């Protein structure tokens, strides 16, 4: 019988060991049993959670908000299997100190703790709070986003190539919300064989996910040809079966395309019928409105060249039901048996849909975006991934009713329309860039109706209407009952507004008649797909809290502007610029970062200020971050604009 260990001699005196454990600067935690009850914590942990009395408490009771963020699942695996686990820069949201839920990032190692007989009694964690490091990197990445397009394209050449071959966006349609994410496994295999598509065809929506055997440029070339061939067939109105049969015939002309797999589904907007074919591809995951998840039945079709034909099956999707298409990289993950991995995917998606899983802080407004992004991050961060991953998700929704506004033809009409139009466009799911473009164009139409159509204020003189069609296009109109009156030529800024409106949207027309003027626009809506090389990477998109009230703050050589700069406020800005710059003699910087709308009148004032500075040999610097409404408009009219902190970025680089 082995001699009992002399703990004092081998490990150290108990009091010394406890004191050393207490003063180690890393967070150390000991948990016991299947419920992971706290049995030991050191000073670093208590300093991190000073108000929580944890010893003796189960971890799930101490941090209930972590349920569904995959941390407890990891502790369970270590306790059950004895295999250590680790995480790098895991994002976790919970109440750490009794002050409310907050988001922090951690590196950690979880290892089993065994009894003398070898059985596992608990787990222990070594944890490092790396929140400051992650946020500093994220801030640097956000600043880099403000560099020139040339610099970004060089830095992200692999992603740019992927976006050139794949669908860069998904449509916005009245009967469904759509989201897509493409996760690149590694930089040197960025040109892979996965692809996705979403086609809005008026009465139906077609979703496609496919996978070509292999990686690299050859697989990407094959993928691109198959994607184009299938897209042409679907766009021509052929059924799912007919389109797949045509691509199966075509694949014989494309070396390397045999055994490519596809999953194609078609949603009828009216009935909710979802017809699909799994051509050698994993079946979609259906997450119902009540947050239950199941895989739909495979249809029995094989990959291209298999000769099995392309039978289809149907499901009826109710309002709130979501369907998730994916490639095998999502379920064939390192260290996970396929059966366990597919079950984990379904369970996680269901918990996120129910609200019990996933992240709660800064969550996307649309449930489908949260389902996509949280599923990828939480599913893959515990195992990693060694293949590209595509996730295309769609949730059926009730269509938003068309917009109809009747308002008085007054100088404030455009401001009233902008507020209601922004709200309606956000409700139908439009991206912020499309919202800015449409709001700008309609605002110009309304201002022209007031200025050119009526000599005085007219009650209910303007009608604005907008609707989203099943082909993904917004069609909007501004109608007045006045008689069009041209202004004299040569007036500063005249004629710029309608030209800007036409440039911002897909199509714009103005028709004058005896009964008034009708201005119409058609604009195709889309939302960008997300292309990343790391589930933790979240590109900084321009985010702006809408406060359209015009405010300008003037300090030495600098004017900071917030809100809408339109025909009613541009004159104020023009005067402030003239005074601060002494009519162009003194240099001036105009910060437009918080501008919510920059109309043609505002552009005219800024153009005049730049022209005065040029003639006087001084500078008028316009500042607006890329993605902001002001940056978008100024780039369109080719007025020089710089992003915030651009000079500091170049100095750092």
UniProtKB/Swiss-Prot annotation:
Protein's organism: Mycobacterium tuberculosis (strain ATCC 25618 / H37Rv)
Name recorded for this polypeptide: Multidomain regulatory protein Rv1364c
GO molecular function terms noted in the UniProt entry: alkaline phosphatase activity; ATP binding; identical protein binding; magnesium ion binding; manganese ion binding; phosphatase activity; protein serine/threonine kinase activity; protein serine/threonine phosphatase activity
Chain positions recorded as Mn(2+) 2 binding sites: 211-212
Modified residues (Phosphoserine): 506, 600
Cofactor note: Binds 2 manganese or magnesium ions per subunit.
Region Anti-sigma factor kinase region: start-end pairs: 397-544
Entry note: thermal dependence: Optimum temperature is 37 degrees Celsius for phosphatase activity.
Cofactor: Mn(2+); Mg(2+)
UniProt note: pH dependence: Optimum pH is 8.5 for pNPP hydrolysis. Optimum pH is 8.0 for pNPP hydrolysis.
EC code(s) of this entry: 3.1.3.16, 2.7.11.1
Phenotype upon changing residue 211 to A: Does not affect autophosphorylation. 10-fold decrease in phosphatase activity
